[in-house]
Design a protein with these regions (language model features):
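C-terminal ends and interior cores of transmembrane alpha-helices
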Residues: 113-126, 327-341
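Helix-loop-helix hairpin linking two adjacent transmembrane segments in secondary transporters
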Residues: 169-216
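Cytosolic juxtamembrane N-terminal segment immediately preceding the first transmembrane helix
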Residues: 2-54
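Cytoplasmic membrane-interface "Motif A"-like loop-to-helix N-cap segments
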Residues: 101-111, 315-326
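Central cavity-lining transmembrane alpha-helices of secondary-active solute carriers
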Residues: 82-95, 296-308
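Helix-breaking motifs and short loop linkers at transmembrane-helix boundaries and internal kinks
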Residues: 71, 103, 124-130, 317, ...
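Conserved MFS/SLC helix-loop-helix module at the cytosolic interface between two early adjacent transmembrane helices
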Residues: 90-126
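Extracytoplasmic gate region of multi-pass secondary transporters
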Residues: 60, 249-303
């Protein structure tokens, strides 16, 4: 059964008015403007990305228990993240091509099923090597879900509201993270660590429930699907690396600088997402409950940061929003990692702005990358640049793991600030796209 309904124009309710009628700029105007089909697509992408986040954080939250169970050093534990992110680049690029060739919803289903199956498999791993392989295979689905879900929603959203809409989708990452932190606190408080980490992975079966609903209720945006079907070129890697000519602009420059931007932002983000739980438990000597409590502040900041960043990217523009929060994120990392021993209240309070800034920078990513590419190669371009950046950014958590043996986790965390500097520089080679319509 096709996941794309017959092509038809979107109604006035499904697009922000552009014919002189007042636009709906209320708090939830962006959601009303999506229309019924768009809201179902939003729900599917929100749920998929939130559960993607939940499955991802089962590992960082269980890292201390895993290291003790398998007798791992910091470098080996950091390798988990690097392998996941590197393989996710392959998965994301392939999912982007798949989305351009067979449709957004079908590709979304493949990614969700993949990461759910291999997350559960991680819970049965008998040794470090097997767990590393399963975690890598999980990355195939993990890499593709965001790119495909973001494109699906972006093609329903109007240019006026696209930043806020995609920022709201991004906020589901914080929801999944919070859910993982709650489950972690409960499971590790009630069950011995040697079994608790396995239970965390087994709960990763939750996304399977989402697949049934998405398969029945969510469809590709009609106008974008029609444009994709008419295009002679679908999902072409050659197209996104084609240099410009005097008569036609190419996409090579966009692809290179967008990949560099993604590298910087994700290098900084995954440094924090991977190592902050370990930092709190090992260097700040917090209990399981204490670590969960401190993470609550950071995750709350992240959730609000996603929503606020989405609003600001529509107000300020895509580039200004990213540049602003790249600077603030770098400052927050340095401040957080250098909090004096014993200043636990300050550590708690600073978790909020750290989570806020490191997430607000992501809010414009979904809309910005989607707007940089034409419909026929949007999935390929967004999937490739976002996930290549994820693979290259994966070097950061591993580097922190090796540096932690001599610098301590807190000192090594500062390395993540370099990523945000790279992101700010990459913006120099990219255009502003706020207000660009997608067809």
């Amino acid at each position: 059964m096709s996941t794309t309904p017959p092509p038809q124009s979107l109604t006035g309710d499904e697009r922000t008015a552009t014919d002189g009628r007042p636009a709906d700029d209320g708090a939830f105007g962006w959601l009303r403007a999506l229309g019924p089909r768009g809201r179902r697509a939003f729900a599917g992408a929100f749920g998929g990305y939130g559960l993607d986040s939940y499955d991802y954080f089962t590992l960082p939250l269980s890292m201390v228990a895993l290291a003790a169970y398998f007798g791992l050093d910091s470098g080996q534990t950091g390798l988990f993240t690097t392998v996941t992110l590197v393989v996710s680049a392959v998965g994301g690029a392939l999912a982007g091509v798949l989305a351009d060739r067979v449709g957004r919803v079908r590709a979304l289903l493949v990614t969700v099923i993949t990461y759910a199956v291999f997350t559960v498999a991680c819970g049965f791993a008998p040794n470090y090597e097997t767990l590393l392989v399963f975690r890598a295979l999980q990355g195939l689905g993990f890499g593709g879900e965001w790119a495909v879900g973001a494109i699906l929603v972006a093609e329903y959203a109007s240019a006026r509201h696209r930043g806020r809409t995609l920022g709201a989708v991004q906020s589901s990452w914080a929801v999944g993270w919070a859910l993982a932190a709650v489950v972690y606190t409960v499971v590790f408080s009630l069950v011995d660590d040697d079994l608790a980490w396995r239970i965390m992975f087994w709960t990763g079966a939750l996304p399977a429930l989402l697949v049934v609903w998405v398969r029945r209720r969510v469809h590709d945006a009609p106008e974008a699907a029609a444009a994709r079907e008419k295009s002679a070129v679908k999902g072409s890697f050659a197209a996104i690396f084609r240099p410009g000519t005097a008569g036609a602009p190419g996409l090579l420059r966009v692809t290179l600088f967008a990949g560099l931007l993604s590298t910087g932002v994700q290098g900084g983000y995954y440094t924090l997402a991977t190592w902050v739980p370990t930092y709190l438990k090992t260097e700040r000597d917090l209990s399981v409950v204490g670590t969960g409590g401190y993470l609550t502040f950071l995750i709350s900041g992240a959730f609000i940061g996603y929503l606020t960043g989405g609003w600001l990217t529509d107000l300020l523009g895509r580039k200004r929003n990213i540049r602003l929060f790249a600077l603030l994120s770098a400052v927050c990392i340095v401040a957080y990692a250098n909090i004096p021993s014993g200043a636990d209240t300050l550590l708690l309070v600073l978790g909020f702005p750290l989570g806020f800034c490191m997430s607000a920078i992501f809010s414009g990513f979904g809309s910005y990358l989607a707007e940089l590419y034409p419909t026929a190669v949007r999935g390929t371009g967004q999937g490739f640049t976002y996930n290549t950046g994820r693979a290259m950014g994966a070097v950061f958590p591993t580097t922190v793991g090796f540096l932690a043996d001599s610098w301590g986790v807190g000192g090594a965390l500062v390395f993540g600030a370099i990523g945000y500097g790279i992101a700010a520089l990459a913006l120099l080679g990219l255009p502003e796209t706020r207000g660009r319509e997608l067809a």
